[in-house]
Swiss-Prot record:
Belongs to the ABC transporter superfamily. CcmA exporter (TC 3.A.1.107) family. It catalyses: heme b(in) + ATP + H2O = heme b(out) + ADP + phosphate + H(+). Transmembrane segments: none annotated. It is a peripheral membrane protein. Part of the ABC transporter complex CcmAB involved in the biogenesis of c-type cytochromes; once thought to export heme, this seems not to be the case, but its exact role is uncertain. Responsible for energy coupling to the transport system. One of its GO terms (cellular component) is plasma membrane. This is Cytochrome c biogenesis ATP-binding export protein CcmA. GO terms for biological process: cytochrome complex assembly. Pfam families: ABC_tran. PROSITE patterns: ABC_TRANSPORTER_2, CCMA.
Length: 216
């Protein structure tokens, strides 16, 4: 399975094979992800979508093959790659004992940012008035928006997002889609999984990688 384009290549997957619990989830998977791409990883449950995202992000190792960033194996340019990577997993990664503002402040500071307005950023994800609320007291949608708020203040080229629309209402999904488009138009890329339909990002704007697992 190969997906390619002639734009500036940010990421390359070369002959990736992933095996989990004696199942081949994908084998010999190769593709390029370019500046300006919005890429959806799709497939049935258990096909390896999250596994592929984690391999691309360098959080898991493939059984075979490699991922390159700007032509170099990500394990040999780890600092540069991590500097340009924003990864949000299926779990929100929000600490329930911290407020929404404290969570955002923590996540941005460990990402190397020191000049930002948390109140303004949280307002962009409709959390005005909830800045001081403990994350553990927020609704599922507010909890997810707290995690996604860091997208509003990110210089990372590569966004890898596992089910970013979970617990987000229709208006929130549309706002995220617009943000993804802006990021792609500025020269970044977005790689995501989702079970929800997108209404702003058209099929013509979206590239897809389809996975289908098989047993060894």
């Amino acid at each position: 399975m190969t997906i390619s384009n002639q734009s500036q290549v940010l990421l390359s997957a070369n002959e990736l094979t992933c095996i989990r619990e004696e199942r081949i989830l994908f084998d010999g998977l190769s593709f390029n992800i370019n500046a300006g791409d919005i890429v959806q990883i799709e497939g049935p449950n258990g096909a390896g979508k999250t596994s592929l995202l984690r391999i691309i992000a360098g959080l898991s190792r493939p059984y075979a093959g490699e991922v390159e960033y700007s032509g170099e194996n990500i394990n040999r340019c780890r600092d540069e790659f991590n500097h340009d990577l924003l990864y949000l997993g299926h779990l929100a990664g929000v600490k329930s004992e911290l407020t929404a503002e404290e969570n955002l402040n923590f996540n941005l500071r460990i990402s190397g940012y020191d000049d930002f307005d948390t109140t303004a950023i949280l307002a962009k994800v409709n959390l005005t008035g909830f800045e001081e609320a403990l994350a553990g007291h927020l609704s599922a949608g507010q909890h997810r928006r707290t995690a996604l708020a860091r997208l509003q203040h990110s210089n990372c080229k590569i966004w890898i997002l596992d089910e970013p629309f979970t617990a987000i209402d229709k208006k929130g999904v549309e706002e995220l889609e617009q943000l993804f488009i802006q990021h792609a138009e500025s020269g970044g890329c977005v790689i995501l999984t989702t079970h929800q339909d997108m209404s702003i990002i058209s099929d013509a704007m979206l590239r897809k990688i389809t996975l289908d697992y098989r047993f060894v």
